[in-house]
Swiss-Prot record:
InterPro entries, per the entry: Thymidate_synth/dCMP_Mease, Thymidate_synth/dCMP_Mease_dom, Thymidate_synth/dCMP_Mease_sf, Thymidylate_synthase, Thymidylate_synthase_AS
Primary subcellular site in the record, as a coarse category: cytoplasm
Gene3D superfamilies cross-referenced by the UniProt entry: Thymidylate synthase/dCMP hydroxymethylase domain
Subcellular location per the Swiss-Prot or TrEMBL entry: Cytoplasm
UniProt name for this protein: Thymidylate synthase
PANTHER family (alphabetical): THYMIDYLATE SYNTHASE 1 (PTHR11548:SF1)
Biological source species: Streptococcus gordonii (strain Challis / ATCC 35105 / BCRC 15272 / CH1 / DL1 / V288)
Keywords, alphabetical: Cytoplasm, Methyltransferase, Nucleotide biosynthesis, Transferase
Gene that this polypeptide is encoded by: thyA
Length: 279
């Protein structure tokens, strides 16, 4: 069993056994009912990408290309436009979070990246001094939250560090997430930011190192318990999936495309499970 599958099953068991139920929940299902969840706090995982440990489960199929396209929308296009996400990338799952009739998700994610010129600053800082301890992406912007409505960022902070091992430089990343839908979004979010880490590493010709993943509130919604039990019953694939970025070292961050990524040795258990999202 892969490390990701072991962690996935352990977290499902912990939530079902030790978790507590939410109170005064904000999300709603599409039928209007309150989307309560069972949750644990303070979840942490570590993956050594350089040793082939990737945070993707084999217990169900994960839409990795759509996940990577979302990252490009946020950090390359630096956009909150749903039209761009739909037309350029054929990704539609953000449409349920449209703010009014604006055609956007509000001043969130890519809009914050653009507002503060975050990616250019990170690349400039890493170029000037890779060993500085201030390479932080933060999407938590109270001023923007007051400016428009919209879902507050779930994956809101990423930190980068480098390590020299022998003659190689490794880029490590730490993703902090305030809230995570364990069964639906856990591995999507993790692999998105692994992809971002790989893009930055390629930009500088570095190797990818470790990926650290902290989640404050890790939950399973109350309409997902049957799917959770099914995932626990499933036997994972024996293969260790790995994501590769097929571009030369030194490729500009903004020139990398979703098609440049390839997920190898991925043979997830089927059929896919159905989930009704909480909005």
């Amino acid at each position: 069993m892969t490390k990701a599958d072991t962690i996935f099953k352990e977290n499902i068991r912990r939530i079902l056994k030790e978790g507590v139920f939410s109170e005064n929940a904000r999300p709603r299902y599409k039928d209007g009912n309150v989307a309560n969840s069972k949750y644990i706090t303070g979840s942490f995982a570590e993956y050594d990408l350089s040793k082939g440990e990737f945070p993707i489960t084999t217990l169900r199929p994960i839409a990795i290309k759509s996940a990577i396209k979302e990252v490009l929308w946020i950090y390359q296009d630096q956009s909150n436009s749903l039209e761009l996400l739909n037309d350029k990338y054929n990704v539609h799952y953000w449409n349920d979070w449209e703010v009014g009739d604006t055609g956007t998700i509000g001043q969130r994610y890519g809009a914050i990246v653009k507002k503060h010129d975050i990616i250019n600053k990170i690349l400039q800082q890493l170029a000037a001094n890779p060993w500085n301890r201030r390479n932080i992406i933060s999407l938590w912007d109270y001023e923007a939250f007051e400016e428009t409505e919209g879902l507050l960022p779930c994956a809101f902070q990423t930190m980068f560090d480098v390590r020299r091992v022998d003659e190689d430089i490794y880029l490590d990343a730490t993703l902090t997430q305030r809230s995570n839908d364990m069964l639906v979004a856990h591995h999507i979010n993790a692999m998105q930011y692994v992809a971002l880490q790989m893009m930055i590493a390629k930009h500088f010709g570095w190797k990818v190192g470790k990926f650290f993943y902290f989640i404050n509130n890790l939950h399973i919604y109350d309409n997902q318990f049957e799917q959770a039990e099914e995932l626990l019953r499933r036997e994972p694939s024996d293969c260790q999936p790995r994501l590769v970025l097929n571009v030369p070292d030194g490729t500009n961050f903004f020139d990398i495309k979703a098609e440049d990524f390839e997920l190898l040795d991925y043979d997830p258990v089927k059929p896919q499970l159905k989930f009704d999202l909480a909005i």
